[in-house]
From Swiss-Prot:
Name of the molecule in the record: Co-chaperonin GroES
Family statement drawn from the similarity comment of this UniProt entry: Belongs to the GroES chaperonin family.
Organism, as annotated: Neorickettsia sennetsu (Ehrlichia sennetsu)
Lineage, uppermost ranks: Bacteria, Pseudomonadati, Pseudomonadota, Alphaproteobacteria, Rickettsiales
Subunit structure: Heptamer of 7 subunits arranged in a ring. Interacts with the chaperonin GroEL.
UniProt-listed NCBIfam families: PRK00364.2-4 (NF001533)
Function: Together with the chaperonin GroEL, plays an essential role in assisting protein folding. The GroEL-GroES system forms a nano-cage that allows encapsulation of the non-native substrate proteins and provides a physical environment optimized to promote and accelerate protein folding. GroES binds to the apical surface of the GroEL ring, thereby capping the opening of the GroEL channel.
Length: 98
């Protein structure tokens, strides 16, 4: 999925998985919904230099489903789509399998 944004350094662009309506189609107001903590990686930076000056590439790749810290990153909108931009270190895990 190309979004027309190039991430820099160790930044990762994630499209959060949206919460579905409540059981039986009950409407859940935005204020009561949980903040997503899982999403699809849509763009990644090339990496960053670590403390000893060597280049460290990013471990995640486009298409990965990741679990991230609840309040990580910054919410951004691009072309009408909501994303979260965060540092790779705010990603906790990569989902394996289908």
């Amino acid at each position: 999925m190309k979004v027309g944004l190039k991430m820099l350094h160790d930044q990762v662009l994630i499209r959060p998985h949206e919460e579905k309506d409540g059981a039986g189609g009950i409407y859940i107001p935005d204020s009561a919904k949980k903040k997503p903590t899982m999403g699809l990686v849509v763009a990644v930076g090339a990496g960053a230099k670590n403390s000893n000056g060597t280049f460290q590439p990013v471990c995640v790749k486009e298409g990965d489903i990741v679990l991230y810290r609840k309040w990580a990153g910054s919410e951004v909108e691009h072309d009408g789509v909501e994303y979260v931009v965060m540092k790779e270190t705010d990603i906790i895990a990569i989902k394996e399998g289908k």
